[in-house]
């Protein structure tokens, strides 16, 4: 029997549950810093909003860094695989159309972490929001009402300094 790749082994036994909270992380292909351009990072944020508007997930916190994103969600319907496939596919199409790029934007795999205790939520939300500071990046923080993704949550979009 052929040996399974590390990414395939990660997916064995993966089970997603509606209403569970997950921290999702996806990296750009070859860790290319695509989102140094703030307008391109906004296209990813737009897909987060679409997923919420379509009832797939409630966005609790997120950050888009130059070469990856962290997205803290509560899954509402479908699976994590479906959610991430849609988010990555639609953001790739939008970014490729805007830049004239072709091909893949994201690494095929993504990382997910299911929260097991309520206190983990605060810890992970702080990690997401602090990520630009930890990475020594410049961040623009928007409060509810001043941002197109108008929720009662703080939204952090990061750009390289």
Describe the role of every protein-language-model region.
Residues 1-161:
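Short catalytic/metal-binding and nucleic-acid-binding patches
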């Amino acid at each position: 029997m052929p040996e399974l790749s590390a990414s395939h082994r990660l997916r064995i036994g993966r089970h997603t549950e509606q209403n569970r909270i997950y921290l999702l992380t996806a990296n750009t292909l070859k860790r290319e810093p695509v989102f140094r351009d703030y307008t391109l990072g906004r296209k990813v944020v737009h897909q987060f909003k679409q997923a919420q508007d379509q009832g797939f997930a409630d966005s609790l916190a997120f950050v888009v860094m130059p070469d990856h994103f962290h997205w803290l969600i509560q899954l509402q319907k479908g699976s994590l695989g479906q959610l991430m496939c849609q988010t990555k596919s639609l953001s790739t199409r939008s970014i490729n159309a805007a830049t004239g790029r072709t091909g893949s934007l994201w690494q095929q795999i993504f990382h997910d972490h299911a929260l097991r205790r309520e206190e983990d939520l605060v810890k992970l939300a702080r990690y997401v929001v602090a990520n630009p500071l930890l990475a020594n990046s410049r961040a623009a923080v928007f409060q509810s009402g001043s941002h197109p993704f108008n929720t009662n949550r703080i939204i952090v979009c990061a750009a390289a300094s």
